[in-house]
Curated annotation (Swiss-Prot):
Stated name of the protein: Selenoprotein W
Crosslink position(s): Cysteinyl-selenocysteine (Cys-Sec): C10-U13
Subunit structure, as described in the record: Interacts with DPYSL2, PRDX1, YWHAB, YWHAG, HSP70 and HSP90.
Protein family (similarity comment): Belongs to the SelWTH family. Selenoprotein W subfamily.
Gene: Selenow
A GO MF label: antioxidant activity
Length: 88
């Protein structure tokens, strides 16, 4: 069973390419293990929120910014690995 990863991003802000880039990187890192879905908000929210198995692990609104550095990406990878370990 694939692990749910949900990204809510500001659609009105044009963040969809950032979501698609993150999705591609995560699919490369965890081939066949993740069910990644993205939702763009129609209004300006500034959101780029990443939830793994129902737990918020990255939030632009809380000061994390975008997932635009290797350290931020590694933080997500660590959270996903921990969630996958709990599923086994």
């Amino acid at each position: 069973m694939a692990l749910a990863v949900r990204v809510v991003y500001c659609g009105a802000u044009g963040y969809k390419p950032k979501y698609l880039q993150l999705k591609e990187k995560l699919e490369h890192e965890f081939p066949g293990c993740l069910d990644i879905c993205g939702e763009g908000t129609p209004q300006v929210t500034g959101f780029f929120e990443v939830t793994v198995a129902g737990k918020l692990v990255h939030s632009k609104k809380r000061g994390d910014g975008y997932v635009d550095t290797e350290s931020k990406f590694r933080k997500l990878v660590t959270a996903i690995k921990a969630a996958l370990a709990q599923c086994q």
